[in-house]
């Protein structure tokens, strides 16, 4: 797996940080997790071909995690170098079908192309993982919106977890259990509180309790661009800590 943080920012508009988007390139597929504003151009800047996407997964339905699906599909339909015939699978948490129906009711004429585009509604409790040619994808409820979930990818003995937006929760700890890399949000300042988001102390708690070996901090606004890694370390996490920027790449 090669993982690229295409968008490390938040709802706050910033020149240097796009909204949430993570691309996972496997041996045979390109997977995208969330598509916030600026994600499509962010893929280009990171050296990723937006037309190569095979699967899209959403963590929840806030615009800063979903809005660029419209320009992506618009581009695939009208601007691809060759007409697409390859399947594009789009998945999201229950009630994803309702969200998708509303979106396509407005934009469908310009989004839906002449290629297979199945949509998959994931129940909030993962019973059977999504099987791809190269990895298994599990998910679990997170503490942000009623529909919010995070994802866990397992491939070739390595585990990568992406929380999406969340506060502390036992299900989040379980999702991140013994992960090689935990990509985790930090939308609240040290000692502060923003409902549905984590402080550096919360990041450290989840990372420590789960036994994650490495933490990559993402989804933080400009006013939190202090030394987040030092704050997470001071809160008790002893593993490796990285702070994501747009274009940060790593393997689990």
Where are the model-predicted features located?
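Binuclear metal-dependent hydrolase catalytic cores
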Residues: 1-162, 167, 172-174, 229-252
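Cap/insert and terminal regions of metallo-dependent hydrolase folds
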Residues: 167-250
């Amino acid at each position: 797996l090669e993982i690229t943080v295409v968008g490390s920012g938040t709802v706050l508009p910033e020149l240097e940080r796009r909204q949430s988007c993570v691309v996972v390139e496997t041996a045979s597929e390109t997977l995208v997790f969330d598509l916030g504003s600026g994600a499509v151009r962010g893929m280009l800047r990171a050296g990723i071909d937006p037309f190569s996407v095979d699967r899209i997964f959403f963590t929840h339905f806030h615009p800063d995690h979903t809005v660029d699906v419209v320009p992506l599909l618009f581009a695939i339909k009208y601007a691809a170098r060759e007409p697409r015939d390859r399947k594009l699978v789009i998945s999201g948490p229950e009630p994803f079908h309702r969200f998708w129906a509303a979106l396509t009711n407005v934009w469908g004429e310009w989004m839906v192309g002449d290629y297979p585009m199945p949509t998959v509604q994931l129940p909030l409790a993962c019973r059977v993982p999504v099987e791809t040619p190269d990895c298994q994808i599990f998910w679990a409820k997170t503490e942000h919106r009623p529909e919010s979930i995070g994802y866990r990818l397992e491939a070739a003995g390595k585990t990568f977890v992406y929380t999406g937006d969340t506060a502390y929760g036992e299900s989040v700890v379980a999702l991140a259990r013994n992960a090689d890399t935990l990509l985790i949000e930090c939308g609240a300042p040290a000692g502060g509180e923003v409902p549905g988001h984590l402080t550096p102390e919360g990041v450290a708690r989840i990372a420590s309790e789960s036994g994650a070996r490495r933490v990559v901090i993402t989804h933080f606004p400009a006013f939190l661009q202090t030394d987040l890694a030092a704050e997470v370390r001071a809160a008790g996490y002893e593993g490796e800590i990285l702070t994501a920027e747009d274009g940060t790449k790593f393997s689990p």
